[in-house]
Amino acid sequence: MELNIADLTWEPLIYPREGKNEKTVKAYVEALTIGAQFPPIKIQRVFNYAKENEKIEATLILDGIHRWFAFQECGFKKIKAIEWKKKTLNYETSRIALLVEAAECNTRHGDRLSPNDKRQIARDIAMSDPECTWTEEALAQKLGVIQQTVNTWISDIRARQRASRNIIIIRLNRLGWTQEQIAKVVGLSRNRVSEIVGNTNFREIDTLLSQGRDMDYIAKHYHMDLALAWSLHLEGKTDQEKFKELGWGLRTWDQWNFNECDERFGDDWPGRIPAQLVAHTLFYFTNPGDLIFDPMAGGGVVSDVCLVFERKCQSFDLATSDNRPEIQYHHWDPQDGHWPITKKPDLIFFDPPYYTKKEKEYKGKANEKTPSISSYSKGEYEKFLESFFLLAHQNVKEMTRMAFLNADWRDFQSTPALKENSDNSITIFDYHRMLSETGWKVTHRIECPLSSERMSGDQVQKMKEKRILGTIGRTLIIARKWGEAIMRDNNYQLIE
């Protein structure tokens, strides 16, 4: 078949060369001018190909890039081509296969691959293959080199990947995952997971600390995150000893002012909460070994703190990421009655979006089919929370506690206090009512105010001039399961 030259794409990430060889292109141009015939180039049609911030369909060149350049220089509009696969491939999931096919084609003929080209291909494939499905032997056969050469090229990458895989296993194990669950995540057998858990030790941590190394160095040394490094270092210490080692003061009153997030715990995330707040909740309302359930995990602050304080943790979120294997995908639709864990938790740490406060930020984490609750109307938001509280009540044990963190929301923007419409507000009193009506007895109310420093001086001055009263109220409500809540005629009834 013949294709329009302008419709073809050269993708350097899958084309196995450091760059085009101008001498080869020039030789092909000279051959074309005297009527030489060239074999067809090899192409592949793909979708999900990223171009200028959008995903498109494209036709990629797998073999014949120098012929393509030569045909362009000679003014040809079309070029003969053959397809590798008749089926259009998903570029995102087929990139390694495309790279391997291109490499094999360019190893056999034409302007053959240099040793540097082959080395880079092997490293690209290895870095894109954390499950190590491409063995050194298989790569050697494709690239036309001996296995030992490939070993030399990619040994450092494979070592990091094995270390990373082992770190994931250790992390999930310490968070209370079963070996069967871990095996599914890392693609190993349960027996192999058991071996790694049993044989991995980090005794060198104390030695490194005694030599003056800090925790940042230790985390990098073991290719692990800081939270896991701290978890290993503080293992066996009491909660109070851990607070001291982490440099956190322990608050003994019901007002927790933590305005700064501790960068050691959790990822950068909309509405990220301070790790100290989570740690205080665990200290007062759980014991080591308890299971914590985080239904909207976000950047993973709760699981990181649970890791350090030796609590088990099951985390879920609408938006997941590769660097957070402990956070599993779940879209909450309380109406369908699906509860994603079988073991009953000791504490639910529920930190949902604070109504519409971060609607724009959360929008990027969701989609039309599974929207963030920050996009809900007031009625939809309240109904969601009521349904979640009821669903949770039906799936926990008698003494399970709910730690519910939320902030007052008032429509005070550009509105003087006297003219605010309270019908648009959602405050802690509403959340207290919802919990009580769905079978939860509130036992503690802890004030955790948001920082007022997020307002500029000009904003504050305008608020004064217009008599606008802002809100920085945020409250942690602790409630325990109490009674049985059932719905009759669209109203909740509590049976004690």
What are the residue ranges of the model-derived segments?
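Amphipathic, charge-rich alpha-helical segments that serve as recognition/docking helices
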Residues: 15-18, 29, 69-175, 198-200
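Key DNA-contact positions within bacterial/archaeal DNA-binding proteins
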Residues: 148, 191, 227
